[in-house]
């Protein structure tokens, strides 16, 4: 089952994000078998990180919640809100995906 995890940063979270970045990426690498898509949410300037969005494939909501609870940014208190929702894959067009992380 697919779950989207939408997490908004605290307004004062830049230092928390910076100091836990390596642990965050290591955690995602250890869970690459369930991670379909992930990335930072950005402000309109395209630079400021304002949160994170992950789409994972796990058998149950409980497993999605466990994955989220153990994610280093969340454990460090970065997020002011976390929303987990089950989703159904509707449209799927990998050819439309950007070629770079910057969206180009």
Regions found by a protein language model. Name each.
Residues 1-104:
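Conserved, structured core segments of small domains
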